[in-house]
Amino acid sequence: MEYSNLRRQIIFMKKNLFDQGYLDEQFNQLEELQDESSPNFVEEVAALFFKDSSRLLTNIEQAIDKYPQDFYRLDSLVQQLKGSGSSIGALRMKNECSVFKVNCNDRNLEGCRRSLQKMKREHATLKQKLESYFQLLRQVGPRDYAVSSRK
């Protein structure tokens, strides 16, 4: 695919990630940190996020299934997940973590379960969308290491 078409596709894809609420300004800030000396910085940070957040989601699921539920532990785990999501600009993940925390504070186990399922879906969707985005970035190569198109 021609370079300019790829670039347009990347800009369009990124704009959609923002318009659909998957990402927030923190993602742009991460991209601004990326430079020629670390052309895959954002992709590497995202990979670390997905590894860590997968572990946290598993831990949350195990804590929900453990009886009696330890809502303080659940709150702590979700706070970690929310912080991780915030660090890469995962807006929908961060927002669903906030909903989970409200359910947790209310001791609403069923609400926590629903929020967990939504967090898992948002996590999987964001991972798929960012993998596609990074794949396009790899196709244009290091000459365009930061596509800093504002949304």
Swiss-Prot record:
One Pfam short name: Hpt
Keywords: Cytokinin signaling pathway, Two-component regulatory system
Domain of life: Eukaryota
GO annotation, cellular component aspect: cytoplasm; nucleus
PANTHER family for this protein: HISTIDINE-CONTAINING PHOSPHOTRANSFER PROTEIN 4, PHOSPHORELAY INTERMEDIATE PROTEIN YPD1
Name this protein carries in UniProt: Pseudo histidine-containing phosphotransfer protein 2
Functional description taken from the UniProt entry: Functions as a two-component phosphorelay mediator between cytokinin sensor histidine kinases and response regulators (B-type ARRs). Plays an important role in propagating cytokinin signal transduction.
A GO BP annotation: phosphorelay signal transduction system
